[in-house]
């Protein structure tokens, strides 16, 4: 009996190492591009439109990967699919390093985002299968590692691009090779692990038609979409807002963004047990509502209340992992399909959301007129107000879902 328990603990430990390393790699691959993009643009002489097209193409690759990963999981199993996603990241690092023509580089970058999309779905499915106790705590702990690597990745990437190896500067190509080669670590742990759920007969799996008829899943799509738009938009717009609206210098504005990410990571590390205690649905309402209140209060209070922009990170950090925990609990036999559908729809929603923010800023600026000195400030306030509105809509959708589930006695 003791031998069986020891073996089980070793298996579970390897599963945890694989998923935690996976989230670290995911955070690295998504966030090393910031320092590299200006150098990539210079080396290939790309204009802003070409650079935008490159990033849009990669977003498309990410969505494509999200859509077919569940099929790979059903056909080959989650272990093989996870290894494939890590391997594609590793290969893309090698191809980026040897790509000196733009078409070859664009194809290599596209492969990286295919791997990125596969990895997001694979990690979510792994979490849903592995974490059967304290689901909220463990989901948030896993995503803490994503937040941690996201915070340090740009700093490491910046430093690594100036490192010399055998008399040659690594630059951005070498940096991508080294950072993405870290994908080898979770490949090794995955090879030594076994994962539950692959042996489940097809007839026991909840079919997509049945999932699609569940209103709760559609509310989850809306909650996740609004939550992720509010989360990701901060990284893209906060520094810009502070520099142009309050005339902060880049160092000071970036410092507040770093505090946002710090609180974001702390929230996932510390508040996970709260979601298990009070329930996932109620947690979604409280945390997204808190983020919305902080954002609107920061806008209303002006520069002296700008610290509340960072405080919003505590609330919005909880949305993604809590939604994954909800799906794992509600659809134990259909979590693969439910996660794939929800994340793919969220991806579409987040692309649309970022376009809307830019549109709102420009529309309000034009409304005030080119000659109005406050036009830019009002436009930026309106755009950032939309970020707060997304958090508020996330809370409202959570409230509607709470009432729906409570009436049916299905609260989670």
PLM features per residue range, with description:
Residues 333-369:
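A late C-terminal transmembrane helix in Major Facilitator Superfamily
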Residues 101-104, 133-134, 138-195:
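Helix-loop-helix hairpin linking two adjacent transmembrane segments in secondary transporters
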Residues 64-103:
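Conserved MFS/SLC helix-loop-helix module at the cytosolic interface between two early adjacent transmembrane helices
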């Amino acid at each position: 009996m003791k031998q069986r328990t020891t073996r089980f603990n070793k298996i579970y430990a390897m599963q945890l190492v694989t998923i935690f390393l996976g989230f670290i790699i995911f955070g690295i691959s998504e966030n090393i591009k910031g320092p590299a993009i200006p150098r990539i643009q210079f080396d290939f002489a790309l204009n802003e439109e070409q650079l935008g097209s490159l990033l849009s193409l990669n977003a498309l690759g990410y969505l494509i990967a999200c859509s077919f990963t569940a099929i790979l999981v059903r056909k080959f199993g989650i272990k093989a699919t996870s290894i494939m996603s890590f391997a594609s990241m590793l290969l893309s690092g090698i191809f980026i390093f040897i790509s000196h023509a733009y078409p070859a580089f664009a194809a290599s970058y596209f492969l990286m985002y295919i791997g990125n999309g596969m990895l997001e779905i694979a990690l979510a499915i792994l979490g849903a299968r592995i974490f059967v106790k304290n689901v909220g705590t463990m989901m948030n702990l896993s995503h803490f590692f994503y937040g941690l690597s996201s915070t340090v990745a740009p700093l490491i990437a910046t430093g690594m691009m100036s490192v010399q190896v055998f008399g040659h500067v690594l630059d951005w190509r070498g940096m991508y090779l080294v950072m993405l080669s870290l994908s080898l670590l979770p490949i090794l742990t995955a090879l030594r692990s076994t994962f539950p759920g692959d042996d489940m007969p097809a007839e026991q799996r909840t079919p997509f038609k049945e999932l699609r008829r569940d209103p709760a899943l559609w509310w989850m799509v809306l909650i996740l979409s609004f939550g992720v738009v509010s989360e990701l938009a901060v990284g893209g717009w906060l520094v810009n807002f502070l520099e142009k609206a309050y005339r902060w210098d880049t160092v000071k504005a970036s410092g507040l963004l770093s505090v946002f990410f710090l609180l974001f990571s702390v929230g996932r590390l510390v508040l996970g047990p709260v979601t298990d205690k009070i329930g996932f649905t109620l947690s979604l309402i409280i945390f997204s509502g808190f983020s919305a209140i902080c954002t609107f209060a920061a806008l209303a209070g002006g520069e002296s209340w700008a610290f509340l922009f960072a405080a919003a990170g505590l609330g919005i950090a909880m949305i993604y992992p809590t939604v994954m925990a909800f799906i794992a609990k509600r659809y134990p036999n259909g979590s693969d399909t439910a996660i794939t559908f929800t994340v793919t729809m969220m991806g579409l929603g987040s692309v649309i959301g970022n376009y809307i923010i830019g549109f709102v800023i420009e529309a309000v600026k034009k409304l005030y007129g080119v000659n109005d000195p406050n036009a830019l400030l009002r436009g930026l306030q309106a755009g950032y107000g939309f970020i707060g509105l997304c958090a508020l809509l996330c809370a409202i959708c959570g409230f509607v879902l709470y009432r729906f589930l409570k009436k049916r006695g299905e609260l989670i």
